[in-house]
A protein has these predicted regions:
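N- and C-terminal low-complexity/disordered segments
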Residues: 1-116
C-alpha cells in the first residue's frame, strides 16, 4: 500500500505545474489575448477574413479596424479577431476565426459571424 501511495505521489509531482494551478500564464493550446491589435500581422489576418467573407457571401464589407483578438497555438496559429467593417453605412463588429500556417503560406477562414 505504501508503494502505491509513493507511485501516485511521484506521478502527481511529475504532472503538477504550480503556475497553472495558481492561474498564472496560459496553458499550451489555450487562447491568449493579442497584445497589439494594430500589429501588421493581426491587421493582415483581419483584412484576409473580410476579403474571404466577401468572396464566400458575395458581400461588400470594407475593413475598418481590429477591435480585439486572441491567438491559439495549434498546427500553426488560430486567430479569433473582432473586426469593425462597414457596408456603406456605419461600421459594425464581426467575429472571424482564421487558421494560419505562415511557413506553408496557408491561411483559411474558418468562420465569420456577425454583426455581433
Amino acid at each position: 500500500m505504501k508503494n502505491l501511495f509513493t507511485i501516485i505521489l511521484i506521478i502527481f509531482f511529475f504532472f503538477y505545474k504550480p503556475s497553472a494551478a495558481l492561474g498564472e500564464g496560459t496553458l499550451s493550446g489555450g487562447w491568449k489575448p493579442v497584445p497589439d491589435v494594430t500589429d501588421p500581422t493581426v491587421v493582415y489576418i483581419a483584412k484576409f477574413a473580410v476579403d474571404e467573407h466577401n468572396k464566400e457571401a458575395h458581400a461588400s464589407l470594407k475593413f475598418v479596424k481590429v477591435v480585439k483578438g486572441e491567438c491559439q497555438v495549434v498546427a500553426g496559429m488560430n486567430y479569433n479577431v473582432t473586426i469593425t467593417a462597414a457596408d456603406g453605412g456605419a461600421g459594425k463588429n464581426y467575429v472571424a476565426l482564421v487558421w494560419n500556417k505562415p511557413w506553408e503560406k496557408f491561411m483559411q477562414l474558418v468562420s465569420f459571424k456577425g454583426p455581433v
